[in-house]
């Protein structure tokens, strides 16, 4: 009797596994590097519980939006609010699928154990930048919000000219790596992007008066081939489990006033 029950259970488990495998999909995700550490973790957990596979193409929100507009196909778009808005206006996002799931501000990263200058006020931050030997940040030419904003801020605060000889642009857009390797004294980027780099610690966020909040959003592509599974992943990104991972990695909840459809 026990043997029969065991065999029946084994057969049932096998059949369930076959059905799950047959229904499993590969979700093609285009995602901003601003949430890379969190999304890698969450995607692995989602794969384990759903049976689906998640294939992620990384880039800046602006660069990925351009690729979609140029005709590339994805199922789920995980971008900055600005990037998703650009695609939504061009009819590239499924109506009603957009969700804001996290936000972040700019921070300053230093190598662990390095001196910690004061950056608590705009004046102190400017002084730190002027005294720095080198500053790493994403190349503004790449269109990433961190690099574009910091370049504009330097111009506005009057240290753009001095910054030119100190600027270090990371090839992969992760400014913290140049600090960790000793190639730069400071790194300016989204807080979660700095936290994800081993050997880097957060000196502090930019003063509130000169900082900017970036909202991270997701939406199902209008041309999605795996719409149902994409919605499953989208809902998972709004779950309490996902919120805990985002918080762990230095992300904040999205502002209540941020746009979502």
Residue ranges and their predicted role:
Residues 1-11:
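Bacterial N-terminal signal peptides that target proteins for export
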Residues 23-62, 66-70, 78-91, 95-104, ...:
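Exported/periplasmic ABC-transporter solute-binding proteins
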Residues 9-20:
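Bacterial N-terminal signal peptides
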């Amino acid at each position: 009797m026990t043997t029969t029950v065991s065999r029946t259970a084994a057969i049932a488990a096998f059949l369930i596994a076959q059905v799950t495998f047959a229904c499993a999909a590969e979700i093609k995700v285009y995602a901003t590097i601003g949430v890379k550490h969190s999304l890698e973790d969450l995607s692995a957990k989602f794969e384990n519980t759903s049976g689906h596979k998640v294939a992620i193409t990384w880039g800046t929100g602006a660069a990925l939006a351009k690729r979609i507009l140029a005709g590339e196909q994805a199922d789920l778009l995980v971008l900055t609010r600005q990037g998703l808005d650009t695609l939504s206006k061009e009819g590239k996002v499924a109506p009603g699928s957009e969700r804001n799931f996290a936000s972040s501000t700019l921070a300053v990263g230093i190598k662990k154990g390095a001196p910690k200058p004061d950056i608590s006020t705009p004046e102190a931050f400017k002084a730190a930048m002027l005294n720095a030997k080198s500053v790493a940040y994403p190349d503004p030419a790449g269109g990433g919000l961190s690099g574009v904003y910091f370049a504009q801020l330097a111009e506005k605060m009057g240290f753009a000219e001095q910054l030119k000889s100190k600027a270090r642009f990371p090839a992969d857009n992760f400014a913290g790596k140049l600090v960790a390797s000793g190639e730069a004294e400071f790194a300016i980027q989204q807080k979660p992007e700095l936290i994800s780099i081993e050997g880097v610690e957060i000196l502090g966020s930019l003063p509130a008066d000169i900082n900017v909040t970036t909202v991270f959003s997701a939406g199902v592509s209008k041309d999605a081939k795996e719409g149902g599974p994409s919605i499953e992943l989208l809902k998972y990104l709004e779950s309490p489990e996902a919120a805990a991972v985002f918080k762990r990695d230095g992300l904040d909840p999205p502002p209540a006033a941020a746009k979502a459809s």
